[in-house]
Amino acid sequence: MMRRRSSLLLALAVVLLALPAPAGAADATPAPAPTAAPAPSAAEAAFLAKIMRDLPMRYPTAQSAIKAGYVRYTNEDETGAISYVNTKAWNTTDPDVPAQLWYDVKGRLIGADFSVRRDADATPAPKPERPSILGIDPKRTITIGAHVHFVTCDKTTGKCVYGKAVGAKKYAAIGDVEHPTADGLVKTGAVKDAASVTAVFLYPAIYDVPVWVVPNPLGQFADKNPNVVPSPHAGKGEDDPM
């Protein structure tokens, strides 16, 4: 679920922690509670009822998602989601085949992304009026910039590294960004050994609607879900090339 992480913000947080605390900082008010999403329309409620019923049956485990063509590409994000992508579904036309599925660290399906490409060639996209995706209010739609994601695995240990990416412009300078390759990643300097790359794909510029599949007291379109408890490792080790 790509609404989120920023290594720049993390770096800034580290810098701020190193600075002397201002007077009264100890009395600072706690962070505000997560915001609830606006109530769904009748059409949205019908859409939510369908995906909350059907998606857990179609993709009950991460392995079932993989068998259906989804590929894991992230670590657990700060909301507790590990994302799997189906690159054939960037233009989502079937609610049963989301562009992305999210699982928690225990392997439970918790959410999905439904999307539409903003451009045809991964160049910086214009921002016209946001579309309604599968009947969802356009106001719920977010925009995400183009970048190239990849996964590497150590052949000796079997350990894989997720959440790695390079900017689309950087990759386009050395090759076809619509069809990135392991060799292309070597040329960008993102990896040293092409053989270590187990997955590489363009994450195009998209309009996107993230939706919780598990019940959410804040609403299925809310950014966070109190019913999903992230692990202590959530939100760490992700690139943000955008």
Question: Regions from the language model: what does each represent?
Answer:
Residues 1-9:
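Bacterial N-terminal signal peptides that target proteins for export
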Residues 10-19:
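Bacterial N-terminal signal peptides
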Residues 23-28:
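Boundary at the C-terminal end of the N-terminal hydrophobic targeting segment
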Residues 30-242:
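Primary mode marks residue(s) on the alpha4-beta5-alpha5 output face of response regulator receiver
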Residues 19-21, 209:
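Hydrophobic alpha-helix-in-membranes signature
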